[in-house]
Amino acid sequence: MISAIEPKNLLRPHSQPVVTTSTLQPDDECNIELRIEDTTVDKYPAKQHARRVAAEIHRDRGLVYLMGQKSTLYEDSDQERTFRQRRYFFYMSGVDEPDCDLTYDINADKLTLYVPDFDLKRTIWMGPTLGREEALQRFDIDEVKYQSSLDEDVKQWAQNQGRGSTLYLLHESQKPAEKVPNVFIDSKTLKQAMDTSRAIKDEHEIGLIRRANEVSAAAHIDVLRGIRKMSNERDIEASFLNTSVSLGAHKQAYHIIAASGSNAATLHYSKNNEPLKGRQFVCLDAGAEWNCYASDVTRTFPMTSQWPSAEAKHIYKLVEHMQESCMVRVKEGVRYLDLHILAHRSLIRGFLTLGIFKGGTLEEIQNSGASNLFFPHGLGHHIGLEVHDVSPESIMAQDNGDYSDNVLISPNNLSPCTTSSPTLKSGMVVTIEPGIYFSQIALDNAKPEQVKYVDLELVKTYMPVGGVRIEDDILVTKTGYENLTTAPKGDGMLEIIRQGDGSCNI
C-alpha cells in the first residue's frame, strides 16, 4: 500500500496548483487532484539568507554585490535564450526575474534590489518588467531602485565607508561596470560563505523541495499508469513533462533521463528516442523544479506489472536493499562516505550470493574496486537550488578534500584518512541513489585485478537488465531523516502499472 504525504503548511507561490495524491488501496486507482488556492504566502526569506551569509563572512562591514542573470539572445538569432536565474543571486533575493542585481550592506543590514529601468518598446512586445512597487510587495527586500542608479550607489557607499572598505563578489568577472575607487575587491570569501549557508536548508526551502517532489511524484505515477500503452522512450518524457507543467512546474530540475534496456547503463543518457519493445526495464530519472528548487527522483520499472525476468527482479531487490540499508542510518553526525561504503558492501554481498562475484572474500573484492564496475558513481549529493547543490565541501570528500573511485572503497586507504570527512548536519537535503549497471564498455575496460572476481559468463545473462537506480531526496534531522520523495517504488509501483489504463504495446 502506498500513501503520499499530504501537504502540510507548505509555502506556496501565489495562486499555484496544489498537488494531492490519494492513498492507494489494492483495487483503487491513483487519483491526482488539482486544487488552486489563492492565499497570501510568506515571502522567500532573502533577508534571513543575507544575514546568514554575512555571519559566514565574519566581518561586520562590507558590501555584498550580486548580479542576476541577464536577458540574452541565442547566437545569430533574435530569439531570447531560456531564462534561468543565477542561483546565488536567488538565494539572497528570491527574485526569479531577468536583468536584476542586488547589494547587501553588512553594517547597515540593508538589502537593496535593482530592477530594470522602464523600457517602452520591451514592454509593448514582452510585457512589463519587474517594477519597484511590485518588487517591494513580493520580495523580502529593504529597498528597490532602478538599475541606472546602481553604479553611482556603489561609489557613494565606498565614499561613505572610507578607504579600505571591501566589496564582496562571487567572481572577479562580476565587478561593477564602473571602477569603484578606494575599495578592496574580494572575490574569494563570498562563495565559500554562501556555499556554507546554502548547505543547510530552512523551513521555507524544505517546503519548496517538498513541493517539487510532490509534483514529481504525480508525474512518475502518471508514467506508471500509462506505461503499458507507451511504445517509445519519448512517450515517457512527454508524459512526465505534461503532468509537471499541468501542475504548475514549468521547468525541470535537469534533463529527463528515460532510459530503457541497455541505455540505462549510461548514467546520463539523454536521447530518449528508442523503442521500448523487448526491453526489460526503464530507468526514469526525472525531477520537477518548484520556484527554483529542485527535486531529483529515479525509479526503475518494467513495462508490465510483472518482473520481466528472474535476473531483473534479483537486481531490483538488491538495489532496493542497498538504498534502504543506507537510508535507515541517516541522521546528524553520520559520515555520508560511510553510507557509500555500506552500499558497496551490500552490493558485493548480493553479487556473491548471486554468483556474479566469485573467488574472493568480501574484503578482497572491495579492495580490488570490482564493485565500481557495476556501481561507478557516488551514493548521492546535496540538493536544493541546484540539483547537484553546493556545499563548503563534498559530502563524499575525504579529509584532504579528494575524491577517488579507486581509493573510495578501499579500507586500507579509508581507515587512516577519513576521520575528519564531513558529516551530515540537520537541515541538509541529500539524495540516496544507489544503482547497479551492466555496462559492456565498463567490463571491456576493467583492470585485471577487478575483473578476476567477475563471472563474465554469468554476467551475460544479466546484461539485458541494463541498469537499475532508485533515488529519493532525504532531509537530515538530528535523530534521523524524512524522505521527501513520495513517488511509489517496489511492489506499490507494480500495482499502479497493473491498474494503469491501456493495453500493453510491448
Curated annotation (Swiss-Prot):
Q: Name one GO biological process term.
A: proteolysis
Identify the domain of life.
Eukaryota
Swiss-Prot/TrEMBL catalytic activity: Release of any N-terminal amino acid, including proline, that is linked to proline, even from a dipeptide or tripeptide
EC class of this enzyme? hydrolase
**Belongs to which family?**
Belongs to the peptidase M24B family.
Residues annotated to bind Mn(2+) 2: D285, D296, E471
- Keyword annotations of the record: Aminopeptidase, Hydrolase, Manganese, Metal-binding, Metalloprotease, Protease
EC number of this enzyme: 3.4.11.9
Q: Does the keyword Hydrolase apply?
A: yes
PANTHER family to which the protein is assigned, alphabetical: XAA-PRO AMINOPEPTIDASE 3 (PTHR43226), XAA-PRO AMINOPEPTIDASE AN0832-RELATED (PTHR43226:SF3)
Q: Which InterPro entries match?
A: Aminopep_P_N, Creatin/AminoP/Spt16_N, Creatinase/aminopeptidase-like, Pept_M24, Peptidase_M24B_aminopep-P_CS, X-Pro_dipept-like
State how the cofactor is bound.
Binds 2 manganese ions per subunit.
Name the job this protein performs: Catalyzes the removal of a penultimate prolyl residue from the N-termini of peptides.
Q: Mention any Pfam family matching this sequence.
A: AMP_N
Q: Name one GO molecular function term.
A: metalloaminopeptidase activity
Q: Which positions are annotated as binding Mn(2+) 1? A: D296, E433, E471
Instruction: State the protein's name.
Output: Probable Xaa-Pro aminopeptidase BDBG_08406
Family annotation (SMART domains):
AMP_N (SM01011)
Organism for this UniProt entry: Blastomyces gilchristii (strain SLH14081)
What cofactor(s) does the depicted protein rely on? Mn(2+)
